[in-house]
Amino acid sequence: MRIDTSELCDVYLDQVDVVEPIFSSFGGVNEFFGKVTTIKCFENNGLIAEILEEQGEGRVLLVDGGGAVRRALIDAELAQLAADNGWEGIIVYGAVRQLSRLENINIGIHALAPIPVGADEDTQGESDIPVNFGGVTFFPEDYVYADLTGIILSQEPLELEELGEE
């Protein structure tokens, strides 16, 4: 289904939070949406791998990496795992790596920046907790919508059929 965050804001501005424009798109899919699953971790991605092993249909993983860009929390292997398990997208308040491979994987990925250094594989961190970045607090079970223009958050699912067709 087509996502246009600009049109969603035109219709639902009083019902959504708009994430600060600090993210870039790195995945093979530019538009995605789904129910939020959260992780908070710092420079390690073992917990991310555990969560991405789950079925992700209709879900978007939000990773609060503290805004650190010294180590990539998402690489091609994790992105492919997410795509294979049906995840709609991943939003990382941190870095990613292996960009030429990420852009060929059928999943949406938004992150702050690329860096070639990988994360530790420790499983330190927390999941299913509120996380705050980009001027917005994300709660598990919220709904997130992302495209090349931006990222918005809603407590309830938005009616996408109300958007105009191009």
Swiss-Prot record:
It is found in: Cytoplasm. It comes from the Bacteria. GO terms for molecular function: endoribonuclease inhibitor activity; enzyme binding. InterPro entries: RraA, RraA/RraA-like, RraA/RraA-like_sf, RraA_gpbac. The keyword Cytoplasm applies. Signal peptide: none annotated. GO terms for biological process: regulation of RNA metabolic process. The keyword Lipid biosynthesis does not apply. Pfam families: RraA-like. One of its GO terms (cellular component) is cytoplasm. Keywords: Cytoplasm. Globally modulates RNA abundance by binding to RNase E (Rne) and regulating its endonucleolytic activity. Can modulate Rne action in a substrate-dependent manner by altering the composition of the degradosome. Modulates RNA-binding and helicase activities of the degradosome. Belongs to the RraA family. Homotrimer. Binds to both RNA-binding sites in the C-terminal region of Rne and to RhlB. This is Regulator of ribonuclease activity A. It comes from Mannheimia succiniciproducens (strain KCTC 0769BP / MBEL55E).
